Amino acid sequence: MDKIKGVFFDLGGTLRIVEKVPEHQERAKVRMAQLAGREDVEAFINMVEARYEPYREWALGENREAGDYELWHQWLLPELGEERLRAVCHEMTYQYRQVKGLRHVVEGGLQVIRGLYERGYRLGII
């Protein structure tokens, strides 16, 4: 049998977990609404969430995810306009992830990664 040369990790729930922190999540919602020029934060977030479901189905069916601009331009906020979206799409994606909660490396995760790396394994993230 061939020797194992590499190890791939899945970030979500394997190396990284999401902690629900309501204050953090609310700040992210407010920031998203600000970036989009919307005053009704909850209505805006609800709209984005509703639009995210068809995108997620598409992404799973295509086995790929859209880049930040494509995500917001084609799926989540096409009415914002190309120029504005190009200026804010990366932060919008970041804030949308923060709406779900704070992400942390799992306990012992860093030590596992360092140990595998020091033993010569190639490491990857899926």
Where are these regions (language model features)?
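Short, solvent-exposed loop/turn segments at secondary-structure boundaries
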Residues: 19-22, 59-61, 100-101
